[in-house]
Amino acid sequence: MTTLHVHSTSPARRLVRRAVNTALVAAAVGALVYVERQTPVEQEGAGAARIPLAAFAQQPAPPRISTSWFCPGVAAGDGLSAGRVVIANPTEAEVTAAVTLLSADGQEQRQVLVPARTQKSVDVLNGRTVGVVVPIVEVIGALASVEQQSEFAAGDVTASCTTATSSTWYFADGVTLDGSSMRIMITNPFPETAVVDVAFTTVDGRRRPTSLQGLLIAPRSVRSLSMPDEGAADEQRVAVEVKTTTGKVVAARAQHYLGGGRLGYSTMLGVPQRLSKWWFAGGNTGANIVEQLVLFNPAEDDITVDAVFTGAGLSGDVANGVAAPSATTSVAVPAGEVVVVNAGNVEGLPEGVHGISVSTKDGSTFVAEHVINQRVAKSNFTAVMTGAPDELATTTWRVPSGVTPGTPRALTFVNTTVFDATVRVSAIGPGGEFPIPSLQTIPLPASGVTVIDMPLDATTGELIIESDQPIVVQRRLSRGRQLVGFSGVLALPQTGANSR
């Protein structure tokens, strides 16, 4: 475990450091543009190292001169009451961040100072009640991290941000029944126009409307597409593909669920590429719970996807390093179609929490999302989560905005190996990184799942989760306003730890 040491710094030295950081941020923003225009790899930020699956949300490894965080965007037009980015600085030095807000009104820039070992919340709406605002945060180095938070009457949401753009983005899940809204927000953070083609798939098949081909996304701007207005109204399933023919972008989805068995709000980044294996940490079956895996095959060939459910009582004896799962299902996903797997129909799957891996034996790639619809008392809620790439299962995860003390079932750990693991949770406080005493030797069985409550005396600071085996970590969050249920979001895997 890394310890952050505290050193005293004179006021004059702090002023010099602040001036240097400001200059570095300005230089890094310019370098961001230069690197993107000169190289085809999906990396941004001065000194960015080549990292695997760069456009997936993750904590990049140093050394980096600066890191750009691209957030999904806040849909003020949906009626949100607040939107913000949270910048977490775990280091012993003040960090300077440049925050750029992109909207239909152009761009707004500001400089933010984040004191050592703290988090800084930055409002992104500034009173706006229409349109979409997309925050981009440029920070010095690679250790600070960023998340986006939205407050809405239908449920508060925390969303991950990413440190890279991509030429492709996919969304497996989507619903527009009974007036449910669905926005696809496409952001071009660069000084040259991006050209984008958008297709969507419903139960009637794939469509490529002429109006969604060759879309021009102006430099440093955001384009919001209302899918019901684009020909996908009153649909039970809407999967979306965003592909650029020129440039790279960031694409996100905002959903307000009003029908079709769903209720609530979600905002999240899309999936930047198809993969052959995904992990989900928030599985749960039981009374009044409908758990679904949404599988999208944008390719030209049919595929078969295997879903394996892991957890207590779900794995047999380990032979030759491989556990024999007792709850599995295989499903054919035709080319260009979406297939939904109802976990409640999987033979041998007991009620309760579990992890899930979905994969193909032949390496065919696809996109997957996980949906929980649950009835609580006289209300219900919907929680939608993206999966973690198998390659990003790792031994260190971070939670930039922390977890509210006393939150029940706050963190879920899934062991992606056939070896027993031990997990420990630390936090960032005024004196640096420190262990949370009751969370230092958390057992996580081979191919198992462990769920923990956050202690009442825990800090609200950034969390660091470490394991001696590769794991996947998901956080559970309150929806606020005394609403029933929860929302879920993956923690940030730390690049450079012992990932696969």
Give the positions of each predicted feature.
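Hydrophobic alpha-helical membrane segments, chiefly transmembrane helices and signal peptide h-regions
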Residues: 17-38, 97, 240-242, 305, ...
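Post-signal-peptide, soluble extracytosolic/periplasmic N-terminal scaffold domains
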Residues: 43-44, 51-57, 76, 86-116, ...
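Short acidic, flexible loop segments centered on an aromatic residue
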Residues: 84, 88-107, 138, 186-208, ...
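Terminal targeting segments of Actinobacterial cell-envelope proteins
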Residues: 1-16
